């Protein structure tokens, strides 16, 4: 059914977002992904989404400012 397909896709998306946030935080803090993973797993879905939005928002702003120069 559509409901089970949606839940499956949503769970996969959440897993991918957690992996991305762990990778970004590890790079920022200079730690391994495994060390940061526990911190990311403890975060709420809302916090993870905010990290994703802020990361891509910064990238978009940097690209926009480069194109305006």
Curated annotation (Swiss-Prot):
Signal peptide: none annotated. Transmembrane segments: none annotated. It comes from the Eukaryota. Keywords: Antibiotic, Antimicrobial, Secreted, Toxin. GO terms for cellular component: extracellular region. Belongs to the cationic peptide 06 (cytoinsectotoxin) family. This is Cytoinsectotoxin-2a. It comes from Lachesana tarabaevi (Spider).
């Amino acid at each position: 059914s559509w409901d089970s397909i949606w839940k499956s896709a949503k769970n996969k998306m959440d897993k991918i977002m957690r992996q991305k946030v762990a990778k970004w935080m590890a790079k920022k803090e200079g730690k391994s992904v495994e060390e940061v993973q526990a911190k990311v797993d403890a975060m709420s879905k809302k916090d993870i989404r905010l990290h994703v939005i802020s990361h891509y928002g910064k990238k978009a702003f940097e690209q926009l400012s480069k194109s305006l120069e």
